[in-house]
Structure formats: C-alpha cells, structure tokens
Amino acid sequence: MTQGMYYIISETTEDRFDEVESLEEALRIARDVVKESQAGDPVSIEHNGRVIRQFVLTPDGEVEEEPVQ
C-alpha cells in the first residue's frame, strides 16, 4: 500500500475496489460500492493502514455510515 492513498475495501470479501488520492473521491466510490453490496456487508475506507470510515447498506436500501471501532 502506498502512503497517503485511500483504499476502498470490502470487509466481507477483503476485495480492494479502488485506491485514490483524495478522501472526497474515496467517499464517493465507497458509497457507490456499498449500494451494489448485500445489506449488512461493510465497505471501508483505509488510510495509512487504518480504517477511517465504514459504510453499510441497510435492508431498506439506504447507505449508512457505521462507527469505526
């Protein structure tokens, strides 16, 4: 992983969907990816080796941000 990059990762499958240089772009991509996921499967944004944001699709089709542990 390159320092300073933001990585969009499925926490369920551990697939890496993309890597980008800006948080804004990472947020957009993560929300798009989670919309295509199954309800309850978290999609995370990692930066400098840490999960900084996490999103999940609710059963009613809404994207929600979850607290990062």
Where are these regions (language model features)?
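Amphipathic alpha-helical interaction segments
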Residues: 14-15, 25, 63
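Short aromatic-glycine-(Arg/Gly/Cys) micro-motifs in beta-strand/loop hairpins
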Residues: 1-16
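Compositionally biased, intrinsically disordered low-complexity regions enriched in proline and serine
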Residues: 7-8, 18, 48, 56
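Surface-exposed loop/edge segments in extracytoplasmic proteins
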Residues: 13-20, 51-53
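A general secondary-structure boundary signal
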Residues: 7, 22, 65-67
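A short, charged, amphipathic alpha-helix used as a generic interaction element across diverse proteins
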Residues: 10-11, 20-42
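N-terminal targeting leader peptides, primarily classical Sec-type signal peptides for secretion
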Residues: 1-5, 30-34, 49, 69
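Short, mixed-charge low-complexity intrinsically disordered segments
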Residues: 36-69
